């Protein structure tokens, strides 16, 4: 049993046959965070903790957008409201998360809300050789399967939309050598390879694959300059295009 309650984490219950009593195994939230999120920043932990508190008052069965920074920076709630969408929408994106970290915190970032509709965009931070070398692709896709398995195991017939990875741009005039090194694997070829496999995985689970990239891509298959912040992340004008592609599913 895992249940986050404020600053205390209930990690298990043992039954003592001699005393015929149950014993709760309790650890501090901060201690458990260090064990399962050792590479995470203090800011990421703080965001997740805040989401945990918000989940306690959130309404169940609503629409959820979840993932990493590309989801966190999506002003979906404001855009939806401005466009006359009255459905309650929650955003549980956390910048910098990879799929391993998402799996560790999947209860807070997804399951605890018991959403009826899920839009998920996670994994761009796995497109790197820093963690698992040239096995990054297989590792990413294996984790995506695990995420979907958990969703369908724990939730009652949710409507799931696996969102395609957005295009990146490695040729912006204001990029530094450091930023290009950080995102060097996010080429049009690798993004397309990932999206093709994501589509197969989504279809194998019977969920929806949603590609919102048609208005984001330039003639070279890269992110259009007018939307680009750093070549990965986008300004709100880019997200307005994304919203136009997915609004029919809200």
Regions found by a protein language model. Name each.
Residues 10-13:
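Flexible glycine-rich surface loops and low-complexity tracts that mediate binding to linear polymers
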Residues 36-145:
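Conserved SGNH/GDSL esterase-like catalytic core that processes O-acyl groups on lipids
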Residues 83-88, 174-184, 221-229:
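Short glycine/proline- and charge-enriched loop/turn segments
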Residues 102, 226-250:
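Histidine-centered active-site loop/cap adjacent to the catalytic His
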Residues 127-130, 169-175, 217-223:
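Short acidic/His/Gly/Ser-rich catalytic and metal-binding motifs that mark active-site loops
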Residues 155-159:
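A short helix->loop->beta-strand "cap" motif at the edges of active sites that frequently abuts
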Residues 170-212, 237:
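Substrate-gating cap/lid alpha-helix
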